[in-house]
Amino acid sequence: MALQTLQSSWVTFRKILSHFPEELSLAFVYGSGVYRQAGPSSDQKNAMLDFVFTVDDPVAWHSKNLKKNWSHYSFLKVLGPKIITSIQNNYGAGVYYNSLIMCNGRLIKYGVISTNVLIEDLLNWNNLYIAGRLQKPVKIISVNEDVTLRSALDRNLKSAVTAAFLMLPESFSEEDLFIEIAGLSYSGDFRMVVGEDKTKVLNIVKPNIAHFRELYGSILQENPQVVYKSQQGWLEIDKSPEGQFTQLMTLPKTLQQQINHIMDPPGKNRDVEETLFQVAHDPDCGDVVRLGLSAIVRPSSIRQSTKGIFTAGKSFGNPCVTYLLTEWLPHSWLQCKALYLLGACEMLSFDGHKLGYCSKVQTGITAAEPGGRTMSDHWQCCWKLYCPSEFSETLPVCRVFPSYCFIYQSYRCIGLQKQQHLCSPSSSPSLRQLLPSVLVGYFCCYCHFSKW
């Protein structure tokens, strides 16, 4: 059964890849749609698939992709492939994401990054963004024979082990190590404060110990500074100042520079090696390394998420939005207790008004009417429809509060007014048609949040 599932997933990934230009030096898919994660939102079958495409020539690749998949891009597509590539390379973490795409029956997002930018990130941890993704188990779909890229991928894993060693005690378990490694790219990530599940790292590691072991096993076996008892799942490392100095000297260049910046007193201007020697003798060496990681991750995560406001989301046709339904108010609004609806691509109706087209609808809703009577059974009945061609159920509600959502760093508000064709499978509305609804949505959300 496991082999059959693996083969089925591989076929799915390859079919999705066939929808894009072929000139890829590396393509991989990651996240909860590929590897199971613990936690309440762990529906792997319906989870979004997250792809990253590495390309040698981003301008040429975006040019071809715009011809094949024009609807995947935000309004920035009208500026052309050169501007898109400039935004990709010069803002955020060097990656351009198109999100909320229905492809081959699955909801996906995909990021595009230059091969040179990726190699720099893997070797030096300039942003620790895609490099951080590649420190956790991913499914590589295709990779070319570029020796430099393959060497950088291996170097990134070894650097992750070294950084984790510096933040761990003298002896620890495999799980402790993998939790530290998985958390490297989340150190200082502002999304862990404002949006992400605080147990995200644990949810990634615990169900996937075997995958982490497969990724790092040979590196641990060959590392001269660790005693790896693989049968017991236990490790011991050299925590002497000499051992820590050796490890600090092999860290990626950007992390070394950040540590130097943190520890170098004003006016001293010590070189990096001198600072690292001091840190190696410091009892708080691990905390200093963690601060250095935060200094890399925090700004890159903020820049990338800010860029995502402009790059994420395709054209207004064929939308996928998560709706947060508000508490019941005197004028007949519906309560959903902060749980979510996710719809993508076949007709979805609210109060008789066509809102979108949804081929898959996923719920975990407990709705309530005044007086406390729940209507979850009826709600589930209305939404438990997965037929791709006939979806005509109308939800039994009067009005829905304007939607607001954070989906994979994309943010969008739409006021649910009497918009007869917010989208259709064959055409997208003009900006003039949609703009009043969008403005009403932003205004209502502003009023709602100002009240609180």
From Swiss-Prot:
Reaction equation(s) it catalyzes: a 1,2-diacyl-sn-glycero-3-phosphate + CTP + H(+) = a CDP-1,2-diacyl-sn-glycerol + diphosphate
Name the Enzyme Commission number(s) assigned to this protein.
Answer: 2.7.7.41
> What Pfam families does this protein's entry cite?
Tam41_Mmp37
Which key words are in the record? Lipid biosynthesis, Lipid metabolism, Magnesium, Membrane, Mitochondrion, Mitochondrion inner membrane, Nucleotidyltransferase, Phospholipid biosynthesis, Phospholipid metabolism, Primary mitochondrial disease, Transferase
The UniProt record lists the keyword Ribosomal protein: no
The places in or outside the cell where this protein is found are: Mitochondrion inner membrane
- List, separated by semicolons, the cofactors it needs: Mg(2+)
The first-level EC class reads: transferase
Q: Name one GO cellular component term.
A: mitochondrial inner membrane
Q: How does it sit in the membrane?
A: Peripheral membrane protein
GO biological process terms held by the UniProt record: cardiolipin biosynthetic process; CDP-diacylglycerol biosynthetic process
The record's annotation in InterPro entries points to: Tam41 (IPR015222)
The outcome of changing residue 86 to P is: In COXPD56; uncertain significance; compared to wild-type, only partly rescues the growth defect in deficient yeast, when tested on respiratory media at 36 degrees Celsius
Pathway(s) per entry = Phospholipid metabolism; CDP-diacylglycerol biosynthesis; CDP-diacylglycerol from sn-glycerol 3-phosphate: step 3/3
Chief location of this protein?
mitochondrion
- GO MF terms held by the record: phosphatidate cytidylyltransferase activity
In the record, the note on similarity to other proteins reads: Belongs to the TAM41 family.
Sum up the protein's function in the record's words.
Answer: Catalyzes the conversion of phosphatidic acid (PA) to CDP-diacylglycerol (CDP-DAG), an essential intermediate in the synthesis of phosphatidylglycerol, cardiolipin and phosphatidylinositol.
Which disease relates to this protein according to its record? Combined oxidative phosphorylation deficiency 56: An autosomal recessive mitochondrial disease characterized by lethargy at birth, hypotonia, developmental delay, myopathy, and ptosis.
What is the designated name of this protein? Phosphatidate cytidylyltransferase, mitochondrial
- Organism, by scientific name, is Homo sapiens
